[in-house]
Protein backbone atom coordinates (compact mmCIF):
# COMPACT_ATOMS: atom_id res chain seq x y z
CA UNK A 1 0.00 0.00 0.00
CA UNK A 2 1.36 3.39 -0.96
CA UNK A 3 1.36 6.48 1.19
CA UNK A 4 -1.44 7.98 -0.92
CA UNK A 5 -3.55 4.85 -0.40
CA UNK A 6 -2.96 5.05 3.33
CA UNK A 7 -4.07 8.68 3.33
CA UNK A 8 -7.30 7.70 1.59
CA UNK A 9 -8.06 4.93 4.08
CA UNK A 10 -7.23 7.23 6.97
CA UNK A 11 -9.81 9.72 5.71
CA UNK A 12 -12.41 6.93 5.79
CA UNK A 13 -11.49 5.91 9.32
CA UNK A 14 -11.02 9.41 10.73
CA UNK A 15 -13.07 11.81 8.57
CA UNK A 16 -12.14 15.42 9.00
CA UNK A 17 -14.66 18.09 9.93
CA UNK A 18 -14.44 21.85 10.10
CA UNK A 19 -17.85 22.17 11.74
CA UNK A 20 -18.05 23.69 15.20
CA UNK A 21 -21.36 22.49 16.62
CA UNK A 22 -23.34 25.20 18.34
CA UNK A 23 -24.63 22.92 21.11
CA UNK A 24 -23.67 22.43 24.77
CA UNK A 25 -20.75 20.20 25.72
CA UNK A 26 -21.62 16.77 27.10
CA UNK A 27 -20.84 16.96 30.78
CA UNK A 28 -22.12 15.21 33.89
CA UNK A 29 -22.54 16.28 37.49
CA UNK A 30 -19.42 17.17 39.49
CA UNK A 31 -19.58 15.21 42.74
CA UNK A 32 -16.30 16.65 44.06
CA UNK A 33 -17.99 19.68 45.63
CA UNK A 34 -20.86 20.01 48.10
CA UNK A 35 -23.77 17.91 46.86
CA UNK A 36 -26.84 19.76 45.59
CA UNK A 37 -29.78 17.64 44.48
CA UNK A 38 -31.30 20.23 42.17
CA UNK A 39 -27.94 20.96 40.54
CA UNK A 40 -27.70 17.22 39.90
CA UNK A 41 -31.08 17.33 38.15
CA UNK A 42 -30.02 20.38 36.15
CA UNK A 43 -26.90 18.51 35.01
CA UNK A 44 -29.11 15.93 33.30
CA UNK A 45 -29.57 18.42 30.45
CA UNK A 46 -25.97 17.80 29.31
CA UNK A 47 -25.64 14.18 30.48
CA UNK A 48 -27.16 12.74 27.31
CA UNK A 49 -29.48 9.83 26.53
CA UNK A 50 -32.65 9.61 28.66
CA UNK A 51 -31.26 11.93 31.33
CA UNK A 52 -31.47 14.76 28.80
CA UNK A 53 -35.02 13.74 27.92
CA UNK A 54 -35.86 13.99 31.62
CA UNK A 55 -34.35 17.47 31.73
CA UNK A 56 -36.48 18.45 28.72
CA UNK A 57 -39.57 17.05 30.46
CA UNK A 58 -38.81 19.09 33.59
CA UNK A 59 -38.47 22.27 31.51
CA UNK A 60 -41.72 21.61 29.63
CA UNK A 61 -43.61 20.87 32.85
CA UNK A 62 -42.30 24.11 34.33
CA UNK A 63 -43.57 25.90 31.24
CA UNK A 64 -47.01 24.33 31.77
CA UNK A 65 -47.07 25.82 35.24
CA UNK A 66 -45.75 29.23 34.18
CA UNK A 67 -48.38 29.31 31.44
CA UNK A 68 -51.10 28.47 33.99
CA UNK A 69 -52.08 25.47 31.88
CA UNK A 70 -54.83 23.08 32.85
CA UNK A 71 -52.66 20.08 33.73
CA UNK A 72 -53.91 16.56 33.04
CA UNK A 73 -52.23 13.72 34.94
CA UNK A 74 -52.83 10.28 33.45
CA UNK A 75 -51.63 7.12 35.13
CA UNK A 76 -52.02 3.38 34.96
CA UNK A 77 -52.81 1.19 37.95
CA UNK A 78 -49.25 -0.08 38.49
CA UNK A 79 -48.30 3.48 39.45
CA UNK A 80 -50.66 3.24 42.43
CA UNK A 81 -49.49 -0.32 43.17
CA UNK A 82 -46.03 1.11 43.80
CA UNK A 83 -44.80 3.83 46.12
CA UNK A 84 -45.60 6.38 43.43
CA UNK A 85 -49.07 6.54 44.97
CA UNK A 86 -47.71 8.91 47.59
CA UNK A 87 -46.05 11.06 44.90
CA UNK A 88 -49.33 11.36 43.00
CA UNK A 89 -51.23 12.11 46.22
CA UNK A 90 -48.80 14.96 46.90
CA UNK A 91 -49.48 16.51 43.48
CA UNK A 92 -53.22 16.27 44.08
CA UNK A 93 -53.06 17.53 47.67
CA UNK A 94 -51.07 20.60 46.57
CA UNK A 95 -53.45 21.32 43.66
CA UNK A 96 -50.60 20.93 41.18
CA UNK A 97 -52.84 19.07 38.72
CA UNK A 98 -56.34 19.85 37.50
CA UNK A 99 -57.61 16.65 35.85
CA UNK A 100 -56.82 13.00 36.58
CA UNK A 101 -57.49 10.17 34.14
CA UNK A 102 -56.74 6.68 35.36
CA UNK A 103 -57.79 3.05 35.45
CA UNK A 104 -60.08 1.07 37.71
CA UNK A 105 -57.08 -0.68 39.25
CA UNK A 106 -55.80 2.68 40.49
CA UNK A 107 -59.06 3.30 42.33
CA UNK A 108 -59.10 -0.24 43.70
CA UNK A 109 -55.57 -0.07 45.06
CA UNK A 110 -55.85 3.44 46.43
CA UNK A 111 -58.90 2.36 48.45
CA UNK A 112 -57.19 -0.77 49.77
CA UNK A 113 -54.07 1.12 50.83
CA UNK A 114 -56.14 3.40 53.05
CA UNK A 115 -56.72 0.37 55.27
CA UNK A 116 -54.13 -2.30 54.47
CA UNK A 117 -50.65 -1.92 52.94
CA UNK A 118 -49.15 -3.75 50.01
CA UNK A 119 -45.94 -5.62 50.86
CA UNK A 120 -42.52 -5.87 49.24
CA UNK A 121 -41.96 -9.25 47.60
CA UNK A 122 -39.79 -10.78 44.89
CA UNK A 123 -39.92 -11.23 41.13
CA UNK A 124 -38.72 -14.82 41.08
CA UNK A 125 -41.06 -16.91 43.21
CA UNK A 126 -43.13 -20.08 43.06
CA UNK A 127 -46.37 -18.64 41.63
CA UNK A 128 -48.45 -21.74 42.38
CA UNK A 129 -47.31 -21.62 46.01
CA UNK A 130 -48.28 -17.96 46.21
CA UNK A 131 -51.72 -18.84 44.91
CA UNK A 132 -52.09 -21.50 47.60
CA UNK A 133 -51.07 -18.95 50.24
CA UNK A 134 -53.55 -16.37 48.97
CA UNK A 135 -50.90 -13.90 47.81
CA UNK A 136 -51.15 -12.01 44.52
CA UNK A 137 -48.00 -10.72 42.80
CA UNK A 138 -47.52 -7.38 41.03
CA UNK A 139 -43.90 -7.51 39.87
CA UNK A 140 -41.97 -7.56 43.15
CA UNK A 141 -44.96 -6.33 45.17
CA UNK A 142 -47.18 -8.80 47.05
CA UNK A 143 -50.88 -8.23 47.76
CA UNK A 144 -52.50 -10.71 50.19
CA UNK A 145 -56.02 -11.70 49.13
CA UNK A 146 -57.55 -10.57 52.42
CA UNK A 147 -57.21 -7.04 51.04
CA UNK A 148 -59.88 -7.84 48.48
CA UNK A 149 -62.15 -9.46 51.07
CA UNK A 150 -62.03 -6.19 53.00
CA UNK A 151 -62.54 -4.19 49.79
CA UNK A 152 -65.67 -6.14 48.84
CA UNK A 153 -67.30 -5.42 52.19
CA UNK A 154 -66.33 -1.75 52.02
CA UNK A 155 -67.65 -1.32 48.49
CA UNK A 156 -70.97 -3.07 49.16
CA UNK A 157 -71.67 -0.59 51.96
CA UNK A 158 -70.66 2.24 49.62
CA UNK A 159 -72.81 0.94 46.74
CA UNK A 160 -75.93 1.06 48.91
CA UNK A 161 -75.40 4.76 49.61
CA UNK A 162 -74.07 5.64 46.15
CA UNK A 163 -76.98 4.16 44.23
CA UNK A 164 -79.71 4.98 46.78
CA UNK A 165 -81.17 8.01 44.96
CA UNK A 166 -79.87 7.47 41.42
CA UNK A 167 -79.56 4.06 39.79
CA UNK A 168 -77.20 5.17 37.03
CA UNK A 169 -74.11 7.18 37.99
CA UNK A 170 -70.87 8.32 36.35
CA UNK A 171 -67.31 7.16 37.14
CA UNK A 172 -66.35 10.70 38.22
CA UNK A 173 -69.21 10.75 40.73
CA UNK A 174 -68.12 7.29 41.88
CA UNK A 175 -64.53 8.47 42.47
CA UNK A 176 -65.58 11.73 44.13
CA UNK A 177 -68.11 10.26 46.55
CA UNK A 178 -65.91 7.27 47.33
CA UNK A 179 -62.95 9.58 48.01
CA UNK A 180 -65.08 11.53 50.47
CA UNK A 181 -65.49 8.36 52.57
CA UNK A 182 -61.75 7.74 52.90
CA UNK A 183 -59.58 8.84 55.81
CA UNK A 184 -55.97 8.77 54.63
CA UNK A 185 -53.86 11.81 53.74
CA UNK A 186 -51.94 9.67 51.23
CA UNK A 187 -55.09 8.73 49.33
CA UNK A 188 -55.33 10.07 45.80
CA UNK A 189 -59.12 9.82 45.82
CA UNK A 190 -59.50 11.57 49.18
CA UNK A 191 -57.29 14.47 48.14
CA UNK A 192 -59.04 14.74 44.78
CA UNK A 193 -62.43 14.86 46.51
CA UNK A 194 -61.18 17.44 49.03
CA UNK A 195 -59.82 19.68 46.25
CA UNK A 196 -62.65 19.11 43.76
CA UNK A 197 -60.29 17.61 41.18
CA UNK A 198 -62.20 15.29 38.82
CA UNK A 199 -60.98 11.70 38.51
CA UNK A 200 -62.02 10.21 35.18
CA UNK A 201 -62.02 6.42 34.92
CA UNK A 202 -63.37 5.39 31.50
CA UNK A 203 -62.79 1.67 32.11
CA UNK A 204 -64.27 1.46 35.60
CA UNK A 205 -65.17 -2.22 35.24
CA UNK A 206 -61.60 -3.31 34.41
CA UNK A 207 -60.61 -4.37 37.96
CA UNK A 208 -62.11 -5.67 41.18
CA UNK A 209 -64.54 -2.73 41.27
CA UNK A 210 -66.08 -4.15 38.11
CA UNK A 211 -66.20 -7.64 39.61
CA UNK A 212 -67.97 -6.40 42.73
CA UNK A 213 -70.39 -4.27 40.69
CA UNK A 214 -71.28 -7.45 38.80
CA UNK A 215 -72.01 -9.35 42.02
CA UNK A 216 -73.91 -6.39 43.45
CA UNK A 217 -76.12 -6.23 40.36
CA UNK A 218 -76.68 -9.98 40.45
CA UNK A 219 -77.42 -10.25 44.14
CA UNK A 220 -78.82 -6.90 45.26
CA UNK A 221 -79.97 -4.47 42.58
CA UNK A 222 -80.01 -5.28 38.87
CA UNK A 223 -81.00 -1.72 37.91
CA UNK A 224 -77.79 0.05 38.92
CA UNK A 225 -75.42 1.10 36.15
CA UNK A 226 -72.47 3.26 35.15
CA UNK A 227 -72.84 6.03 32.54
CA UNK A 228 -69.59 6.86 30.71
CA UNK A 229 -70.78 9.24 27.97
CA UNK A 230 -71.60 12.03 30.43
CA UNK A 231 -68.03 11.81 31.67
CA UNK A 232 -66.68 11.85 28.13
CA UNK A 233 -68.65 15.04 27.47
CA UNK A 234 -67.22 16.55 30.66
CA UNK A 235 -63.67 15.55 29.74
CA UNK A 236 -63.99 17.20 26.33
CA UNK A 237 -65.35 20.33 28.04
CA UNK A 238 -62.29 20.46 30.31
CA UNK A 239 -60.16 21.04 27.22
CA UNK A 240 -62.54 23.35 25.40
CA UNK A 241 -62.82 25.66 28.41
CA UNK A 242 -59.06 25.77 29.03
CA UNK A 243 -56.87 28.50 27.56
CA UNK A 244 -53.86 26.16 27.66
CA UNK A 245 -53.53 22.45 28.38
CA UNK A 246 -50.59 20.30 29.43
CA UNK A 247 -50.43 16.53 29.71
CA UNK A 248 -48.28 14.44 32.04
CA UNK A 249 -48.81 10.84 30.96
CA UNK A 250 -47.28 8.26 33.30
CA UNK A 251 -47.71 5.02 31.41
CA UNK A 252 -50.13 4.78 28.53
CA UNK A 253 -53.25 2.82 27.60
CA UNK A 254 -56.79 4.15 28.05
CA UNK A 255 -55.85 7.10 30.33
CA UNK A 256 -53.22 8.50 27.95
CA UNK A 257 -55.44 8.14 24.92
CA UNK A 258 -58.44 9.77 26.58
CA UNK A 259 -56.23 12.76 27.38
CA UNK A 260 -54.88 13.23 23.88
CA UNK A 261 -58.13 12.28 22.12
CA UNK A 262 -60.26 14.77 24.04
CA UNK A 263 -57.64 17.47 23.47
CA UNK A 264 -58.14 16.91 19.75
CA UNK A 265 -61.46 18.77 20.06
CA UNK A 266 -59.59 21.96 21.01
CA UNK A 267 -56.93 21.57 18.30
CA UNK A 268 -54.47 19.59 20.39
CA UNK A 269 -52.72 19.84 23.75
CA UNK A 270 -50.26 22.71 24.11
CA UNK A 271 -47.72 20.67 26.10
CA UNK A 272 -47.13 16.96 26.68
CA UNK A 273 -44.73 14.84 28.70
CA UNK A 274 -44.77 11.06 28.33
CA UNK A 275 -43.07 8.52 30.60
CA UNK A 276 -43.23 5.13 28.93
CA UNK A 277 -41.46 1.86 28.26
CA UNK A 278 -43.81 1.13 25.34
CA UNK A 279 -42.24 0.07 22.05
CA UNK A 280 -43.11 2.17 19.02
CA UNK A 281 -42.33 -0.65 16.62
CA UNK A 282 -45.50 -2.62 17.37
CA UNK A 283 -47.76 0.26 16.31
CA UNK A 284 -49.63 0.31 19.61
CA UNK A 285 -51.04 3.40 21.29
CA UNK A 286 -48.98 2.58 24.37
CA UNK A 287 -45.76 2.77 22.38
CA UNK A 288 -46.71 5.77 20.26
CA UNK A 289 -44.45 8.80 20.89
CA UNK A 290 -45.74 12.39 21.06
CA UNK A 291 -44.78 12.94 17.42
CA UNK A 292 -47.42 10.42 16.35
CA UNK A 293 -50.07 12.33 18.31
CA UNK A 294 -48.98 15.49 16.45
CA UNK A 295 -49.84 13.75 13.17
CA UNK A 296 -53.40 13.22 14.45
CA UNK A 297 -53.77 16.77 15.76
CA UNK A 298 -53.91 15.57 19.38
CA UNK A 299 -50.79 17.51 20.39
CA UNK A 300 -49.84 20.86 18.87
CA UNK A 301 -46.48 21.23 17.17
CA UNK A 302 -44.82 24.51 18.12
CA UNK A 303 -41.99 25.39 15.74
CA UNK A 304 -40.42 27.96 18.05
CA UNK A 305 -39.41 25.54 20.81
CA UNK A 306 -40.12 21.95 21.89
CA UNK A 307 -43.47 21.53 23.59
CA UNK A 308 -43.36 17.78 24.19
CA UNK A 309 -40.93 15.19 25.53
CA UNK A 310 -40.76 11.42 25.88
CA UNK A 311 -38.79 9.77 28.67
CA UNK A 312 -38.22 6.14 27.77
CA UNK A 313 -37.83 4.78 31.28
CA UNK A 314 -39.64 2.90 34.02
CA UNK A 315 -41.77 5.36 35.95
CA UNK A 316 -40.66 4.52 39.50
CA UNK A 317 -37.15 5.62 38.54
CA UNK A 318 -37.93 8.94 36.90
CA UNK A 319 -41.38 10.24 37.91
CA UNK A 320 -40.23 11.37 41.39
CA UNK A 321 -37.33 13.21 39.72
CA UNK A 322 -39.73 14.93 37.32
CA UNK A 323 -41.93 16.00 40.22
CA UNK A 324 -38.93 17.25 42.21
CA UNK A 325 -37.51 19.22 39.30
CA UNK A 326 -40.76 20.71 37.99
CA UNK A 327 -42.80 21.24 41.16
CA UNK A 328 -40.40 21.40 44.12
CA UNK A 329 -37.28 23.14 42.78
CA UNK A 330 -37.19 26.56 44.49
Curated annotation (Swiss-Prot):
Q: Which Gene Ontology BP terms does the record give?
A: spermidine metabolic process
Q: Which InterPro entries match?
A: Deoxyhypus_synthase_arc, Deoxyhypusine_synthase, Deoxyhypusine_synthase_sf, DHS-like_NAD/FAD-binding_dom
User: Can you state which reaction this protein catalyses?
Assistant: [eIF5A protein]-L-lysine + spermidine = [eIF5A protein]-deoxyhypusine + propane-1,3-diamine
Q: Where is the active site?
A: 298 (nucleophile)
Broad enzyme group: transferase
Instruction: State the UniProt keywords alphabetically.
Output: Hypusine biosynthesis, NAD, Transferase
The residue stretches assigned to a coiled coil in this entry are none
Give the cofactors, semicolon-separated. Answer: NAD(+)
- Pathway(s) where this gene product acts: Protein modification; eIF5A hypusination
User: Mind telling me which GO cellular component terms the entry cites?
Assistant: cytoplasm
Family annotation (Gene3D superfamilies) = Deoxyhypusine synthase (3.40.910.10)
Q: Where is this region: Disordered?
A: 1-25
Molecular function terms, GO-annotated: deoxyhypusine synthase activity
E.C. numbers:
2.5.1.46
Keyword Transferase attached: yes
Q: Which HAMAP family match?
A: DHS (MF_00153)
Family membership noted in the UniProt record? Belongs to the deoxyhypusine synthase family.
Summarize the protein's role: Catalyzes the NAD-dependent oxidative cleavage of spermidine and the subsequent transfer of the butylamine moiety of spermidine to the epsilon-amino group of a specific lysine residue of the eIF-5A precursor protein to form the intermediate deoxyhypusine residue.
Protein name (record): Probable deoxyhypusine synthase
Record organism: Halobacterium salinarum (strain ATCC 700922 / JCM 11081 / NRC-1)
Amino acid sequence: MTGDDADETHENVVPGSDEDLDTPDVRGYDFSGEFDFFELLDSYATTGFQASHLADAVDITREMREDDATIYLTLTSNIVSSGLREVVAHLVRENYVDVIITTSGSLTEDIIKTAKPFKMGEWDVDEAALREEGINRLGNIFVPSDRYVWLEEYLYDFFEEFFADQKVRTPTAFARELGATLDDEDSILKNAADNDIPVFCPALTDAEIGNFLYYYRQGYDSEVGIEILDDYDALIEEGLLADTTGLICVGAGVPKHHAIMTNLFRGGADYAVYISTGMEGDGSLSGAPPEEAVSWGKIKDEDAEPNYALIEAEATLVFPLLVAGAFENP
